C-alpha cells in the first residue's frame, strides 16, 4: 500500500509538472513566433503595408523596434505592482488587438499601421519578460533546469518557424492573412493563460514552485 501511495504521488507530481511544461511551451511558442516574424522581416512587412521601399520601410521598422524597447521598461515595474497574471492577460489583449487591426485593415493609413504595430510591440514587453521569469518561478529545484532548457528550446523552435515560415506565408497569402495568423496565435495564448496562468506575485520561490493543486493555477484575474 505504501508503494501504491508513492506511485500515486509520483504520478500526480509528474502530471503537475507536465501541465506547467505544456503551459510554458505553448505560451512561449505563441509569443515568440509573431514577435520574431516582425523583428526579422520588419522592412518587408512594412513595405507590404505601403510604407514604401528601402529607407522608409526601415524607418518604420525602427520605430516599431523602439516600441519593443520602451515597452519592456514599464513592464519590469508592472510585474510586481500589477502582478504576473494580470500583466500577461492585459498585454495579450492589446497585442492581439494590434495584430487584428493590421490583419483586418491591411490598406490602413500609415499612422494607423504604425500605431497598431506600436501597440503590439509596446505590450509585448510583459510577456517577453515572463518568458524567462516563469520557468524559474513555476518549477521545483529538481526540474527547474530542465524547465529553463525547455523554454529555450521552444524559443528556438519559434525562431525557426518565424524565419522560414513568414516569407513563404507572406508570398502566398499576403500581409493581411499573415497578421491574422499572428493574432490567432496570440489569442490561443490568451485563452490558455486565462485558464492556466498562475499568479506568483508576492510569493517566495518555494511557494511558487510548489506543486500542490491549491497553490498555482487560479482563474482569478
What does each model-found stretch correspond to?
Residues 72-84, 170:
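Helix-to-loop junctions at the C-terminal end of transmembrane segments
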Residues 170-184:
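A membrane-interface helix-boundary motif in multi-pass transporters
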Residues 94-107:
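C-terminal ends and interior cores of transmembrane alpha-helices
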Residues 12-73:
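Extracytoplasmic gate region of multi-pass secondary transporters
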Amino acid at each position: 500500500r505504501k508503494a501504491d501511495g508513492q506511485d500515486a504521488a509520483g504520478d500526480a507530481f509528474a502530471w503537475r509538472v507536465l501541465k506547467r511544461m505544456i503551459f510554458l511551451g505553448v505560451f512561449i511558442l505563441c509569443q515568440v513566433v509573431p514577435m520574431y516574424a516582425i523583428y526579422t522581416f520588419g522592412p518587408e512587412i512594412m513595405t507590404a503595408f505601403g510604407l514604401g521601399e528601402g529607407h522608409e520601410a526601415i524607418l518604420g521598422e525602427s520605430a516599431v523596434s523602439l516600441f519593443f524597447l520602451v515597452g519592456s521598461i514599464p513592464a519590469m515595474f508592472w510585474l510586481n505592482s500589477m502582478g504576473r497574471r494580470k500583466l500577461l492577460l492585459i498585454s495579450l489583449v492589446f497585442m492581439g488587438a494590434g495584430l487584428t487591426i493590421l490583419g483586418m485593415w491591411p490598406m490602413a493609413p500609415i499612422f494607423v499601421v504604425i500605431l497598431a504595430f506600436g501597440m503590439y510591440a509596446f505590450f509585448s514587453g510583459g510577456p517577453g519578460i515572463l518568458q524567462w521569469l516563469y520557468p524559474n518561478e513555476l518549477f521545483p529545484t529538481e526540474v527547474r533546469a530542465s524547465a529553463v532548457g525547455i523554454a529555450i528550446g521552444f524559443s528556438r523552435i519559434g525562431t525557426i518557424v518565424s524565419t522560414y515560415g513568414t516569407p513563404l506565408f507572406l508570398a502566398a497569402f499576403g500581409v493581411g492573412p499573415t497578421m491574422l495568423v499572428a493574432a490567432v496565435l496570440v489569442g490561443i495564448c490568451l485563452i490558455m493563460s486565462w485558464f492556466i496562468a498562475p499568479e506568483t506575485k508576492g510569493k517566495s520561490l518555494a511557494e511558487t514552485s510548489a506543486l500542490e493543486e491549491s497553490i498555482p493555477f487560479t482563474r482569478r484575474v
